[in-house]
Amino acid sequence: ALVFFIRPLNIVFGTMNSDLSFKQKMLLAWLAPRGIVAAAVASYFAIELEKNGIDGAQLRAMVFLLIAVTVLSAGLTGSFVANLLGLKRKSDQGWIILGANAVARALAKLMKSNNEEVILIDENPSLCRMAEKEELKVIYGNGLEENILLRAEVDLRKGAIGLSENEEVNMLFARRTKEVGKVPRTYISIKRDDEGVTADMVDEVGAIIPFARAIDLEKWSLWVRKEQIETKELIYDNKEEITAENAFDKETEGLILPLTFLHHTTLIPIGHNSSIKKDDKVGCLVRSEKLEQFHDWLSQSPFSISS
């Protein structure tokens, strides 16, 4: 009676003026409350009964047994019931980006436009406000702290991308997301291949270099802030596969910044090891003042502008 009648009735009255859906109320009725109040009250009444010469031990034992059974049943069946009601959050959903700089926001907006959930994390309040103005989800705080990562639901994410202007912090972020959330895919933005955090070091930790190569993130952020870039979508026309780092080599530095990679219906941030196949699409930023140079490169490349 307590589990199937009294507790659900309690939830119905307790959530009467809330915005919870019927299914959410059903889940609450199955999982809550857990019995701490009942335990305290039972102990109090047991003591009072014993003061009056009545054995209260049986009452206390019965209440604690009921609590143990209901907690155990909720723990074992909670996931199943949530899934049955369609309320269980799917794993492998969305991305976390460390940094809310202009490039990070440009990447987040492009991914969001393709129905990918993205959460930015940054300690800079002004950058967080800019992200909010652009209608992006952002968390203010240190992305290396476990509580911040848990707020971003790191354990449910497809991947994590370190895009701060400090490449050592990006490396630590990739490691922390794997430790805390077992994130399957991590990206580490670096400045150069042979100094500081190198490409070999990124490979050693099983991470990926975003943008297909090392980049000067500060310069690209400046160009984005000054609106000196244009967004382009390229389509790969060649039958032979090519890796992103070969497709966007040193000739494209300061000219093109590849951001995303679309294969069939799956969009992910492009990495140095992304394998580009025929009809795959690459979302990128192009310097406005170098459009002529971009078109010259395009005419000799295996890409064309997606219509």
What is the predicted role of each segment?
Residues A1-F4, L28-G35, I67-A68:
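Transmembrane helix-bundle signature of multi-pass membrane transporters/permeases
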Residues A1-G14:
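Transmembrane helical segments that form the transport core of multi-pass membrane transport proteins
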Residues L9, M16-K23, L27, A38, ...:
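Cytosolic regulatory regions of ion transport systems
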